[in-house]
Amino acid sequence: MKDKEIKEEVLKEEINKEVNEKKKCECEEGKEEAHEHKNDEHACCGKHNHKEEIEKLKAEIEEWKNSFLRKQADFQNFTKRKEKEVDELKKFASEKIITQFLGSLDNFERAIESSSESKDFDSLLQGVEMIVRNLKDIMSSEDVEEIPTEGAFNPEYHHAVGVETSEDKKEDEIVKVLQKGYMMKGKVIRPAMVIVCKK
């Protein structure tokens, strides 16, 4: 092989080497300028542009984070508002029933005032009876009912405060009622205080 041919061969190898070097993708950090990008891919290697994807994901994460913080703040405000409403309800829960009882209080005061002027006991008695009926109507409107005290003693509804013998009553039957008991919507709010028969 002649010197000229050898030189040409070496030159071709050098050119091929240089072309291959240009085609080679240098993906290491700090060498991004060696990439030719096309449609978010490296023209040289077909790999995605990870930097853009990372920025996009960071933006999405930030958006989700802000959305979460807003919802958390909304929930905290909702909770505080509901707590305030519950406190208000507790504070004025008895307002309705108290308002109803005010009428009975007015009637009591009028009955006392009227009887003190006229000294008429019968009128006072009638006034008191009317007030008792009024109070029972109020209680009935709130589903409050008197606990029955006829027949056998029942510890769920009655509170025995004493025993005594009785020829008219059977063992464990109620002999006497010392204080009436009441239920509200089926729940005992005050048991009846009774005397029970023991033979």
From Swiss-Prot:
It comes from the Bacteria. Coiled coil: none annotated. Keywords: Chaperone, Cytoplasm, Stress response. InterPro entries: GrpE, GrpE_coiled_coil, GrpE_head. GO terms for molecular function: adenyl-nucleotide exchange factor activity; protein homodimerization activity; protein-folding chaperone binding; unfolded protein binding. One of its GO terms (biological process) is protein folding. Its main location: cytoplasm. It is found in: Cytoplasm. GO terms for cellular component: cytoplasm. Homodimer. HAMAP family: GrpE (MF_01151). Belongs to the GrpE family. Participates actively in the response to hyperosmotic and heat shock by preventing the aggregation of stress-denatured proteins, in association with DnaK and GrpE. It is the nucleotide exchange factor for DnaK and may function as a thermosensor. Unfolded proteins bind initially to DnaJ; upon interaction with the DnaJ-bound protein, DnaK hydrolyzes its bound ATP, resulting in the formation of a stable complex. GrpE releases ADP from DnaK; ATP binding to DnaK triggers the release of the substrate protein, thus completing the reaction cycle. This is Protein GrpE.
